[in-house]
Amino acid sequence: MTSVVVIGTQWGDEGKGKITDFLSQDAEVIARYQGGDNAGHTIVIDGKKFKLHLIPSGVFFPEKISVIGNGVVVNPKSLVKELEYLHTEGVSTENLRISDRAHVILPYHIKLDQLQEAAKGDNKIGTTNKGIGPAYMDKAARVGIRIADLLDKEIFASRLKTNLAEKNRLFSKMYESEELSFDEIFEEYYAYGQQIKQYVTDTSVILNDALDAGKRVLFEGAQGVMLDIDQGTYPFVTSSNPVAGGVTIGSGVGPSKINKVVGVCKAYTSRVGDGPFPTELFDEVGERIREVGHEYGTTTGRPRRVGWFDSVVMRHSRRVSGITNLSLNCIDVLSGLDTVKICVAYDLDGERIDYYPASLEQLKRCKPIYEELPGWEEDITGCRSLDELPENARNYVRRIGELVGIRISTFSVGPGREQTNILESVWSNI
């Protein structure tokens, strides 16, 4: 029994797709366990970029099984579009499996997401408007439609009719917006269901059978710990649990079967959307990091907010997710800076604290306490070991490991698979 979980430790966009792709080379099954097509990951293979939002990174390995677990909310329209994109690029999807227990995102979820966000005005959360939150709301309210329901024509029609009647009353009465058509949604989405039914199965059985057989299973998280609905910067969070604990709920695999948790982070910090960000940069250094790091959302295209590395955030992520190994990305983006900074603690009303407050009001008053380190001028994109890094870059990497309290297993100096360097295999000693 060998399993590794890959999670984001910041606010998403840490490079999980790349690291999952890298670790997938030694895995036999790769599974997603939460989120939806609000998650975007970019994978570079042989110099070619592939952008996915829903299908796991493991799809690029035809000999491995790629799983969308029950904790994922699936937009069938987006899924079919992504399948067509992969087929056009010559990528086979025969290895894909989709949980029959996963919930379905429908047009009324997307419309409700947009209307609710618009109604918040200045208090908007910064949602991707993909219908993720409303879909999880229906799931919790026990009125959601699952993939298994989508494939059954009579059940789908019955549940869609009931749900749409309620949603249309909400649209017309509360938001004074146009109602949606039952016939249009039913015909379009039932057809999508038929297009994906070949992939649908009980994925919990597949995952547990694989683990019981001693196969290597890799669980791929979406978003990041700081966007977790319980442990993140609530309410500026997603509607699911990106933390490692979400694996067991979202995949149907018990906690005793999880061996290692790899936390993925950047050598700096980024965030899309609104919410607290203590180390955010508003100067020319921030702009430089954004441009050099191509910090624009994969899903939204929005410019990402950027800031210095925050070890307070990282220690919070380590604690609530039980992170055992760290993967440090984008070190190359910081090349050319005279000085690099790491936030080691916060100043809250004159008191030094080393924890991440739950209160948004306290977070607003938190000022980062920085440790400054000398930067490096060298181009490090060709470095293939820690020893090849310039001394200052090497010291920066080591200091991050010391402050976070997690051993660094891999570090990356560019987007390519070959630019990911192994310090310690996460598949060993399991």
UniProtKB/Swiss-Prot annotation:
It is found in: Cytoplasm. GO terms for cellular component: cytoplasm. It holds the Pfam family Adenylsucc_synt. HAMAP family: Adenylosucc_synth. Mg(2+) binds at D13, G40. One of its GO terms (biological process) is 'de novo' AMP biosynthetic process. It comes from the Bacteria. Transmembrane segments: none annotated. PANTHER family: ADENYLOSUCCINATE SYNTHETASE. Binds 1 Mg(2+) ion per subunit. Homodimer. The active site is at D13, H41. Its cofactor is Mg(2+). Plays an important role in the de novo pathway of purine nucleotide biosynthesis. Catalyzes the first committed step in the biosynthesis of AMP from IMP. It catalyses: IMP + L-aspartate + GTP = N(6)-(1,2-dicarboxyethyl)-AMP + GDP + phosphate + 2 H(+). Gene3D superfamilies: Adenylosuccinate Synthetase, subunit A, domain 1 (3.40.440.10), Adenylosuccinate Synthetase, subunit A, domain 2 (1.10.300.10), Adenylosuccinate Synthetase, subunit A, domain 3 (3.90.170.10). GTP binds at residues 12-18, 40-42, 304, 330-332, 412-414. Substrate binds at T298, T299, T300, G301, R302, P303, R304. Pathway: Purine metabolism; AMP biosynthesis via de novo pathway; AMP from IMP: step 1/2. One of its GO terms (molecular function) is GTP binding. IMP binds at D13, E14, G15, K16, N38, A39, G40, H41, T128, R142, Q223, T238, R302. Signal peptide: none annotated. Keywords: Cytoplasm, GTP-binding, Ligase, Magnesium, Metal-binding, Nucleotide-binding, Purine biosynthesis. Belongs to the adenylosuccinate synthetase family. This is Adenylosuccinate synthetase.
